[in-house]
Amino acid sequence: MPTVNQLIRKPRQTKPARNKVPALKGCPQRRGVCTRVYTTTPKKPNSALRKVAKVRLTTGIEAVCYIPGEGHNLQEHSVVLIRGGRVKDLPGVRYHILRGVLDTQGVKDRKQRRSLYGAKRPK
């Protein structure tokens, strides 16, 4: 353990914070092309088939992204916009695909929280 004098001469160094979304390179969103669209199963207490896509970003990085909402039109070579935000029960999924932007259609018949799912206002 250092003495008080040693700490005055050379204070403790703080560890740099770990970046939670490295593929975005400091940007709010990034564009990419789907290389694979598939389903995967969540961690232990939960059970489902979660829709995910592997996306090659404009930065050249491959990221696994979650496709939110019910039903989607994504397939290989679809151009998508991704944002940060992990999915707690899917290990390795740190990004979300934005609905209603580029090749991704919005969720049909969505009444509430429409802006998150790219749904137009119902008539």
From Swiss-Prot:
Annotated positions of the 3-methylthioaspartic acid modification: D89
Membership in a protein family: Belongs to the universal ribosomal protein uS12 family.
Gene Ontology annotations of biological process type: translation
Described purpose of this protein according to its UniProt entry: With S4 and S5 plays an important role in translational accuracy.
An MF annotation (GO) of this entry: tRNA binding
Gene source species: Phenylobacterium zucineum (strain HLK1)
Phylogenetic placement of the source organism: Bacteria, Pseudomonadati, Pseudomonadota, Alphaproteobacteria, Caulobacterales
Protein name, UniProt field: Small ribosomal subunit protein uS12
PROSITE patterns the UniProt entry points to: RIBOSOMAL_S12
CDD domains: Ribosomal_S12 (cd03368)
Protein encoded by which gene: rpsL
Chain ranges passing through the membrane: none
Subunit structure: Part of the 30S ribosomal subunit. Contacts proteins S8 and S17. May interact with IF1 in the 30S initiation complex.
Keywords for the protein's UniProt record, in alphabetical order: Methylation, Ribonucleoprotein, Ribosomal protein, RNA-binding, rRNA-binding, tRNA-binding
